[in-house]
């Protein structure tokens, strides 16, 4: 039963996403609403992204640096950290953070509007709910997800470099040379793959959260249930998509 509901929800989300993309191509975008959503998914989520990026870079660096230093190849620390972060940890952790911060807000906002009949009122005014409510949220996530991902990668690398220099005596120039041109180094292909993942994840987060919000029925209790369901389904879908994209991009 759970699997049936999962695929039913996923199909419904894809339909809503398709409708939103159709409105986007037709140029039916409210700039004011888009700006509001950009503020929520951008600056509103920036602090948790930066803090987690610093923590992830430091922890990853501790694990890698301790092993490489004992093997006498500490000059490769920067490259391994950069590649590991760009290919996997930055897009996936950023998506997880955005799910917790933004998807919950989308599902709760639209769910509340649904149970208080505000969406029906929008429809009666001959305004398409998907155009008015989903399009700005989808666009904001597609725009801000790669930006947040790049910021996450940047602070992770800087925290890793500082930790390597202080505790493992790796000169900054050695660390950054490894990032750019070591045996394992960060390439444009890695960055492209990271941005592709972040855009796809942002798209999934927005359409799934909006679908749960728009289909909420009942009262305040059901709004909470929809919000929880949106987070769970988003995390599962993003994880599965990450496996698929990793195989396509690096397999």
Which residues does each predicted region cover?
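Selective transmembrane-helix segments that form parts of the transport pathway or gating/packing helices
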Residues: 42, 46, 50, 89, ...
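Hydrophobic alpha-helical transmembrane segments of multi-pass membrane transport proteins
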Residues: 77-120, 148, 208
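Active-site cofactor/substrate anionic-group-binding motifs, chiefly glycine-
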Residues: 41-93, 97
